[in-house]
Amino acid sequence: MHLSELTHPNQLHGLSIAQLTQIAAQIRDKHLETVAATGGHLGPGLGVVELTLALYQTLDLEKDRVVWDVGHQAYPHKMLTGRYNNFHTLRQKGGIAGYLNRRESPFDHFGAGHASTSISAALGMAIARDLKGENFKVVAIIGDGALTGGMALEAINHAGHLPHTNLMVVLNDNEMSISPNVGAIPRYLNKIRLSPQVQFITDNLEEQFKHIPFFGENLTPEMQRLKEGMKRLAVPKVGAVFEELGFTYVGPVDGHNLEELIATFQHAHTIPGPVLVHVATVKGKGYAIAEKDQVGYHAQNPFDLVTGKAKPSSKPKPPSYSKVFGETLTKLAENDPRIVGITAAMATGTGLDILQKRVPKQYIDVGIAEQHAVTMAAGMATQGMRPVAAIYSTFLQRAYDQIVHDVCIQKLPVFFCMDRAGIVGADGPTHQGMYDIAYLRCLPNMVLMAPKDEAELQRMIVTGINYTDGPIALRYPRGNGYGVALMEEGWEPLEIGKGELLRSGEDLLLVAYGSMVYPAMQVAEILKEHGMSAAVINARFAKPLDTELILPLAKQIGRVVTLEEGCLMGGFGSAVLEALQEADILVPVLRLGVPDILVEHASPDESKADLGLTPPQMAETIMQKFGVPQRATVVTAS
């Protein structure tokens, strides 16, 4: 059977090991071919090909439920559930999403983009099943470090207290999140994986049973039960932590041995109550380059399959905001032992890998544990340290109570650095950094700032380090800067709450925040061509606003436009409106930003065009709102 003929996962039932092996090879080929062309997550999906095939052969997905954690592990799942022929559209506008999406397929039983949610969701399904008197299996697949997340442990704690609720948790243990796993739980799992007794039983017992004449080949499920029993005799502590928490522990099992996996899952389905199946996999399996560099090939931009190297761009690009952040913070940390960079399993993505290499004592990776990261930072701040919590905008949402309760109420000087703020592109709605302005602006004692370019980012990093009167948050976008000159040292901090007037004008006031400042300057140029004179303010701070700069100009000019790369509800434009209202300045205001919608996966440029946030589109919207001279011809987006 060719994978293109498979439209339903139940077609896997009854296929031989040889046929499944052939399909596994087709999945890997398609996975590699597609990600090399479109970009996307590479290593996670390659590591779960056999796991997915074996599990789905033992389930009836007409009724059974499968919940994948994180979602980027699930590329093989997508190919096996009717999306193989469209898989080439992965992460492209209008194509297959890079994460699970209930709107995309009835087999995506629960959406996921963030980590550690699967066990909670699966347990909810299992409890609902039992309350309704229904009968189907529920399986959660958790991996890529997600078991280090507190929510996963909360769910395990709850599920273990429900001995009559049938639930299978498959632990895809590849020893990695994006970076290598950290913490006591991964260390415990490694002890199980590396136990000589367990390895001997796993590697040798099955082969010995196969040599029993006549019926050795047919003993697979029973053999699996015997292997589990012998592991417990040889190593009584195997899986003890999970057993003490109320789960029946099964494993570890070779995650790339189809025969052993099928037997293990068949055996696990017969065990009543919560069951945890520990599957040892290799991230990037089947692509030697990815197996060797599991961090670098967790996710990739388009690359050459033969060399593994990124496809060259037409011209050299300026450094990314993440790199500028990492380099600048590291230089400051080298001269200030109070500075500590904190990441939640995202060292490379945030640029803190630079700090990790050069000043390792001032670097902490807490694993996928944003809540812990924030409160730990708060504790460090009480002792005079300068904690810098470098967390993507979308992931900082996970620690909201800690920001409120442990940081803001106590007015502790924690410096939040939010990478990927704004439109992120192909990762889609689970990863868009749309909401941080709104969800942080409402908090007492919080200061918010955003740079117009990478040079201003450097100054804001120094500003955040120097600010000790409470928490301060810095947002900056995904991608490369503008190529402006950068200083190696001697950065001057900014005055809190002070913006800058970049351009004078008489007809219109553009007040832009962060990544929208340069586009605002382009808008002003377009408007100039149509006879409109626009002043441009780089706000720098969303809280506190520079009302001394904004309000007099708003009153004088009489027409205001705000520009932000974030949600309009409660965002930067709302802050300007509130300031105008409180000052009794009643002038027309146009807010440009992201409306009350989910921004689906597409390139950042495509998303901005869809939202009307390209400079020509914004200029057209402004002229439609406020009117233009009769001689004007509106410039539209091509």
From Swiss-Prot:
Pathway where this protein functions: Metabolic intermediate biosynthesis; 1-deoxy-D-xylulose 5-phosphate biosynthesis; 1-deoxy-D-xylulose 5-phosphate from D-glyceraldehyde 3-phosphate and pyruvate: step 1/1
Annotated S-S bridges: none
SUPFAM superfamilies named among the record's database cross-references: Thiamin diphosphate-binding fold (THDP-binding), TK C-terminal domain-like
Binding note for cofactor: Binds 1 Mg(2+) ion per subunit.
EC number(s) reported in the record: 2.2.1.7
Keywords assigned: Isoprene biosynthesis, Magnesium, Metal-binding, Thiamine biosynthesis, Thiamine pyrophosphate, Transferase
GO cellular component: cytosol
InterPro entries tied to this protein: Dxylulose-5-P_synthase, THDP-binding, Transketo_C/PFOR_II, Transketolase-like_Pyr-bd, Transketolase_BS, Transketolase_C, Transketolase_CS
Stored SMART domains: Transket_pyr
Signal peptide segment: none
Any one GO molecular-function label of the UniProt entry: thiamine pyrophosphate binding
Binding residues annotated for thiamine diphosphate, in chain numbering: H72, G113, H114, A115, G145, A146, N174, Y287, E370
Residues that hold Mg(2+) according to the record: D144, N174
Essential cofactor(s): Mg(2+); thiamine diphosphate
Functional note: Catalyzes the acyloin condensation reaction between C atoms 2 and 3 of pyruvate and glyceraldehyde 3-phosphate to yield 1-deoxy-D-xylulose-5-phosphate (DXP).
PANTHER family for the chain: 1-D-DEOXYXYLULOSE 5-PHOSPHATE SYNTHASE-RELATED, 1-DEOXY-D-XYLULOSE-5-PHOSPHATE SYNTHASE, CHLOROPLASTIC
UniProt family annotation: Belongs to the transketolase family. DXPS subfamily.
Name of protein: 1-deoxy-D-xylulose-5-phosphate synthase
Species: Thermosynechococcus vestitus (strain NIES-2133 / IAM M-273 / BP-1)
Taxonomic lineage from the root: Bacteria, Bacillati, Cyanobacteriota, Cyanophyceae, Acaryochloridales
Gene that encodes the chain: dxs
